[in-house]
Amino acid sequence: MKMTSIQQRAELHRQIWQIANDVRGSVDGWDFKQYVLGALFYRFISENFSSYIEAGDDSICYAKLDDSVITDDIKDDAIKTKGYFIYPSQLFCNVAAKANTNDRLNADLNSIFVAIESSAYGYPSEADIKGLFADFDTTSNRLGNTVKDKNARLAAVLKGVEGLKLGDFNEHQIDLFGDAYEFLISNYAANAGKSGGEFFTPQHVSKLIAQLAMHGQTHVNKIYDPAAGSGSLLLQAKKQFDDHIIEEGFFGQEINHTTYNLARMNMFLHNINYDKFDIKLGNTLTEPHFRDEKPFDAIVSNPPYSVKWIGSDDPTLINDERFAPAGVLAPKSKADFAFVLHALNYLSAKGRAAIVCFPGIFYRGGAEQKIRQYLVDNNYVETVISLAPNLFFGTTIAVNILVLSKHKTDTKVQFIDASELFKKETNNNILTDAHIEQIMQVFASKEDVAHLAKSVAFETVVANDYNLSVSSYVEAKDTREIIDIAELNAELKTTVSKIDQLRKDIDAIVAEIEGCEVQK
């Protein structure tokens, strides 16, 4: 019987937590995450590679072959197809099987990771493989002070991941890698004092963003995330739509080196071949990649909120083709609109961008107001959606989603107030599938729905100083109790009458106590 996604998730969490308990103590949670995810990745590419070599032939078991039978031609063909090569002796299953008795485990793992990476040298996949295992440091003193201690903890991680009942990755209904990541972040980030929210967009929010960006498109040339994080948004697009709809693959840029590695691992883990994704490392705003790859038919992004950037301190940026049309740069203390303008520049004429934004950018004055004016005057703003608070890790802020389009059929701007659409779960709120469906139906129809959605004329937005706050246009539901004045007056009259009677009764009692006769 197939497990449901809830059962899969619960089982995965239980197993991962068991691994955590086995190695707890010397490695703090944040560093530990890299070892579990690195081992998970190592296991996956080993099984994936074995499956490729065996090609469905039950008579072949790649893991049992001797390394010496591998010819140069076999190796060359495999690297051209898969992007890397793993010898039978280097497979996860063979290393994990001997992990508890291998005195050279940490050195062997390091050699294997170097060999896998170097197998791609000189091939088109070189950049996609390089540095993937950089955060799996087998020599780290956090694993223990002696080689014996290091090996014991590495063995515990390998044996734990070996025991994960993963089955066929493609049959799983959940984003396995992302779910492991989400689980580890939520359990460790608070204790480690580090926030994982900027690196990971929860799957329920990712689902909504992907559907917004891909809505109505029968096919897209490629999908792009300028602040890719761990790749969760790009992968949600893959999960939401048939593989063939995204023709040329997945593109993203990420500034954090560790997260950049996680994003590349994530692509492989979801069976996206090296020639179907391109994740670059670097600062999107000042060192943008993919200028030759644009435009993109679908852009999804959850960029960092209100981060500082060089802005006007770099005099060349105002002439940059991404920012020049607006005539002004985003404030140095708040780069939010710089990411928006970057995405707009990379968007195709038929495409959509769905970007998570800090709410302040929609109503503040100054440069941000001028950028809003540019976006509205050129009819790029399709929809602004306000979400419920506490949907993301690391922030309780109620954020917005900005949907940009270059192919609108009218000049109206749609506003959707989804702030009441959420389900409370432990420390965070979530969007259910029903909530997402409700938002998408309103988004698609562009119909006005009381207290939920309103399509506003261009002239109204202009008259409102280009304010794009949802609350300025969608009237919140009045949750105050409706008072019936006539009924209230009647109740008041009855109450006053009762009070008068009580006073008389009290006076009578007092008079009796004092021995006086009450006058009638």
From Swiss-Prot:
Q: Which CDD domains match?
A: AdoMet_MTases
Catalyses:
a 2'-deoxyadenosine in DNA + S-adenosyl-L-methionine = an N(6)-methyl-2'-deoxyadenosine in DNA + S-adenosyl-L-homocysteine + H(+)
Keywords from UniProt, A to Z, are: DNA-binding, Methyltransferase, Restriction system, S-adenosyl-L-methionine, Transferase
GO annotation terms (biological process) = DNA restriction-modification system; methylation
Q: Which SUPFAM superfamilies match?
A: S-adenosyl-L-methionine-dependent methyltransferases
Q: Does the keyword S-adenosyl-L-methionine apply?
A: yes
Its Enzyme Commission number?
A: 2.1.1.72
Stored Pfam families: HsdM_N, N6_Mtase
Q: A single Gene Ontology molecular function, please?
A: DNA binding
Tell me the superkingdom of the source. Answer: Bacteria
Enzyme category, top tier: transferase
Q: InterPro entries from the xrefs?
A: D12N6_MeTrfase_N, DNA_Adenine_Mtase, DNA_methylase_A-5, DNA_methylase_N6_adenine_CS, Restrct_endonuc_T1M, SAM-dependent_MTases_sf, T1MK-like_N_sf
Provide the binding site for S-adenosyl-L-methionine.
E198, F199, F200, T201, P202, Q203, S230, G231, S232, E254
What NCBIfam families is this protein classified in? hsdM
Q: Provide the family line.
A: Belongs to the N(4)/N(6)-methyltransferase family.
- Outline what the protein does: The subtype gamma methyltransferase (M) subunit of a type I restriction enzyme. The M and S subunits together form a methyltransferase (MTase) that methylates two adenine residues of the sequence 5'-CCAN(7)ATGC-3'. In the presence of the R subunit the complex can also act as an endonuclease, binding to the same target sequence but cutting the DNA some distance from this site. Whether the DNA is cut or modified depends on the methylation state of the target sequence. When the target site is unmodified, the DNA is cut.
Its subunit composition reads: The type I restriction/modification system is composed of three polypeptides R, M and S; the restriction enzyme has stoichiometry R(2)M(2)S(1) while the methyltransferase is M(2)S(1).
What else is noted?
Type I restriction and modification enzymes are complex, multifunctional systems which require ATP, S-adenosyl methionine and Mg(2+) as cofactors and, in addition to their endonucleolytic and methylase activities, are potent DNA-dependent ATPases.
Q: What is this protein called?
A: Type I restriction enzyme EcoprrI methylase subunit
What organism does this protein naturally occur in? Escherichia coli
Which gene is this protein's source?
A: hsdM
